[in-house]
Amino acid sequence: IDTDLTDHSPTHAKNNRKKAHATWHRGYLFTFEAIIAAKVKELTGDDWALPYWNYLDNTNPDARRIPDAYLAATLPNGAPNPLSKYPRRAGITSLPSGNVAGFSLEAAEENDFIVGKNGTVGFGGGITGNFAQFGNWTGDLENNPHNTVHRLVGGNDGFMADPRLAGLDPLFWLHHCNID
């Protein structure tokens, strides 16, 4: 695995758990999407946008279900499905209800938006010590739904649960596009 794809060194990780995480995250996804879209345009002439998985849509009874394209072991022609080959929590087809809290984006527009424990303001909380993916810190929005979905999908041994491998699972991109 190319180390650039799995770089969660302190330099890379410093973008997590900080007030600037949301703006860094948007730039990261924007760049990834632009690279893929340019290649799709070159090969097919079609426009392309990164899809997202809106598991927080309370109006959709199937919102928590992992999209079928990411569950089927094979494609319609019988070939192995590259979207489902990555290790995930055994038997997961849907996020359990109650584990991913609903979140109001409108609330984030308020000047006194509080998302953390003990009144911490912001997406990822304050400055922290050494990086520990999915650890306990004060930024509740980054922790839930972001980290909760990583843990639920990845389980103990799945790629989504391992920050060094999470980006290799195609569900990572749907999840992160939704977070964005």
Residue map of PLM features:
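C-terminal accessory segments of proteins
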Residues: 1-180
